[in-house]
């Protein structure tokens, strides 16, 4: 077992690795205590997107998404799950990815929070971790945005 950036990698067999990625979000949503006000579906989408891109970047195939939602299922949790489903639509793998998770039904909450963990598998022969070398040209497009900056573009 080892870590690479935000990933945890576990050798399952001599040919197969399990890759685990995760991300979280807090204080962003439509609840009274949220600092950034957006539809919870947006949180589900972007939090899933971040963890999914980290997993796919090394060549892993996602098999399971585990959401830990610090909100009630009806209706905030369901909106977040809608965003999770929207994030995986472009992969055309929805039937191959098991989505499971948990919500907070015991305590009323006044702030939106969620965590996401994605588990994937990769054949060791297809493992790809590349590092930039002196001869590489690295191009970055766009402007980094966070919180309200991103919400304004929605």
Label every model-predicted segment.
Residues 1-154:
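Helix-biased detector of long, well-ordered alpha-helical tracts
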